[in-house]
């Protein structure tokens, strides 16, 4: 019974810890009393002090000031790595979700440069997979490597396009990309989207160093390859866009969009860890929404292009479950 009670206390403390971190995410520099008033269920001040002290020791929370003026805020690391219950988040209606509705200007210049995106255990898993990839690669001829990349290109083109609402099956995609055979009952735009993916991936394979360092111009070039003949405006957008399914409103000022992308390039190019480079490219290009359409397509291809540039195994995204989402 004592052991069960101790386990219940630990579980309760963990729940309270998550609530504290989530509260501080949206209410930085809060007093302990303010934090306690928002934590459910109600706990004693002694317990609250102990849990906050644990958060400070773990590097999740910073203490600002002393005595009655003491305030608490999240560390940059906790801003990105604190636990988040996705099921609870998506169970709420859009207007009930707690989100930052405007662009976070501190993210790229303040938070991301100061944090590690992967733990040592996560990096060990990634580099274990990378070691197997390199071993597999060393046993291939140039022709076999190209065929392997062709297969991965088909998988990635299909999945990336499916995420955008494309209805081609994987088999139909293979026929289209290998034999230029369009599928009956499908639109021309769907075929063009898939062929554009192939062109972008072929370009990266032919110029493997192209994305070793990324730039605004190179991001725009990959975007142009992915969206050609689809009626999508080239280069940075000049008008406001909205995103279905969220109250987040991307930047609507061309100069701020340009600055955010350029800052992202500096951040990514300055990182030494390749997996961090690829992940940052994936999330930041998607977050900034610099183009009227094709943002996530561009992010997925550039992320893979970075992996390829450094001799790392690209990702097909095949295991992702398809849901309707904005581009």
Model-derived regions: residue spans:
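FIC/Doc superfamily catalytic core
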Residues: 6, 10-326
